[in-house]
Amino acid sequence: MRQKTLDVLEFDKIKSFVASETISDLGREKVSKMSPATDFETVEFQMNETDEISQIYNKHRLPSLSGLAKISPLIHRANIGGVLNVTELNLVKRLIQVQNQFKTFYNQLLEEDEQVVKYPILNDKMNQLPILSDLFQEINEKCDTHDLYDSASYELQGIRSKISSTNQRIRQNLDRIVKSQANQKKLSDAIITVRNDRNVIPVKAEYRQDFKGIVHDQSASGQTLYIEPSSIVEMNNQISRLRNDEAVERERILTELTGMVAAEADGCLIAESVMGQIDFLTAKARYARSIKGTKPTFYKDRTVYLPNAYHPLLNKDTVVANTIEFVDDIETVIITGPNTGGKTVTLKTLGLIIIMAQSGLLIPTLDGSQLSVFENVYCDIGDEQSIEQSLSTFSSHMKNIVEILQETDKNSLVLFDELGAGTDPSEGAALAMSILDHVREIGSLVMATTHYPELKAYSYNREGVMNASVEFDVNTLSPTYKLLMGVPGRSNAFDISRKLGLSLGIINKAKTMIGTDEQEINSMIESLEKNSKRVDEQRIELDRLLKEARKTHDDLEHQYEQYKSYEKKLMDEAKEKANQRVKSATKEADSILKELRTLRDQKGADVKEHELIDKKKQLDDQYEAKSLKQNVQKQKYDEIHAGDEVKVLSYGQKGEVLELVSEEEAVVQMGIIKMKLPIEDLEKTKKKKEKPSKMVTRQNRQTIKTELHLRGYRYEEAVSELDQYIDQAVLSNYEQVYIIHGKGTGALQKAVQNHLNKHKSVKSYRGGMPSEGGFGVTVAELK
């Protein structure tokens, strides 16, 4: 894509914002190379890649990437025989640590949330990460942040131990000298210091002859000599030899560790590449959150729909968002309206958002944006007059337009700002229309701004062209920056003049001079503006309702998944309990069989072997392995009748058969829900004997329903009605009843459940299953 376009649309500023969100040079390097892709698959992949990280970033706290650094130069040096120092080895160690932490984080996501498989790109990156635990362990055990540990090798530990003990002896020797009363007046200061890596004491020059040893230095005034006493010369020499030995051993260990790094060179480079990309994508995610970015959907057919788009470089708290759309077969949009009304900002918003999207950045629009992939974006925006070339504004623009017309094609987007401006209005308007015709013949998508009234009629004479305008508030005498698609701009001169106090006589006379047609056009445009405003308001309301519907759908879907998961858990637990019982029974049977055989052998009891084996097999056949699917006994058509109590296997709920529709289907009542279900999904259950009732007759039960409707009740009424109903239900020997309170604000549901929680006749309660009415129902189990 043209660099000139990226510069005019200020894409470099977007990149600088993203770069500020990176942690490492690896991420910043990738941001610096970020540019719009033009291949459909690449654009879609980059967007999905960013969206995956953004989803995780918005839900979870990502592991820290601090300390991540570029190590490829170090790997190269290790491969050609160089030796890495401790600081460089720590950079390798930190890379491994960062990748391990991120992989652990991702694995925890997999365990906690099965939905994480919807991140296939990130999953692939995590699978690419190599196992470098051994290398990490070696570096970690031998290096701290500044130096090798004493324990890095047996030899190093021994050398440093000798250095320490020798230094201690030297210190003790010098302490005796400097603390001696006889030497107090001979020393410049009672301290031990170091010169030329040797331990020395500061002696006054006039007492030089009193101290045998080597003079290593003197003060600037010459009054103090730094002398190494002869008593410690040999010990200092020993320290020097040990320091050399330490350096040799240190080099050997670093060489060994560097060799290990070289052996894992490929893995380290893969880790660097993946974690650098993670840093880059995380920076994109952070920036997306700051602009409330959303993911667009890309189409191979030419499409542009940007709901409530705004320019990301403007203050999002004050900028006016506009829906930019090329509807149906529209290929050219012409924006008219007042200067400083936001026409140029609209052009830049469209161009910049497309560049951002094709660079894998989430875009500043509402959800639901749709875009196609453009091979290039061309723009002629702003005053690019060249002083060096002595070009006028018109000439400068025309030179740029000529270049655009030579390069653009049907897969390009072209943005013209004030097309044809800077010359005679009639000639400029004619040129503008001719240029637009030419670009339309090429097939490019075009958005242009103009103040020429001739271009308002342009769209009515050509197919695929739409007018648009920026709104002007005549009451405040200022633009609203609101884009009106499909509505041409109109002159506000008369309204503004009247608002400013110009006499109506002058205004009315002026109106007669412009002709009836022009006045009718302005009236028509004013009507279109009002209709457009009303449509926008309706669209906003529809968007709100759609969001609410989607949220409700997602909530219900999530609850259904929870229900299915809970149902599976209960089934597994039931199977496990059943298996344990069968195992116990089998074990008991084995014991009995053993006793019977023993009895037969001892007393000759008349028990046949094959009969014992048959009994044992009957018990074994009852066992159901946990891994097998639920083995349910299917009821034949002639075994289920209307009025039978059954268990609906797919829902795990009890119900009553109301009607047999055919040999395959029956109508079943489950609580307040009637459903037509396959007979193979039904399991006949035994009716429980009713408890005798002293208070009411059997006839009374039939008059009490299993559900109580409380929708529309106030709190006091609902509680009173609920108490009476529960008393009647208990007397009727009901085990379970349904309280229907509806969803609403949830206040009535809360009141009902709080009261049930305290009621002495209520054993437990729960929210309704989806098959029972969901949130709008509470199911109470009675004592």
Curated annotation (Swiss-Prot):
Residues 708-783 form the Smr domain. It is an enzyme of class 3 (hydrolase). Keywords: ATP-binding, DNA-binding, Endonuclease, Hydrolase, Nuclease, Nucleotide-binding, RNA-binding, rRNA-binding. PROSITE patterns: DNA_MISMATCH_REPAIR_2, SMR. The keyword Thylakoid does not apply. It holds the Pfam family MSSS. Endonuclease that is involved in the suppression of homologous recombination and thus may have a key role in the control of bacterial genetic diversity. Belongs to the DNA mismatch repair MutS family. MutS2 subfamily. This is Endonuclease MutS2. It comes from Staphylococcus haemolyticus (strain JCSC1435).
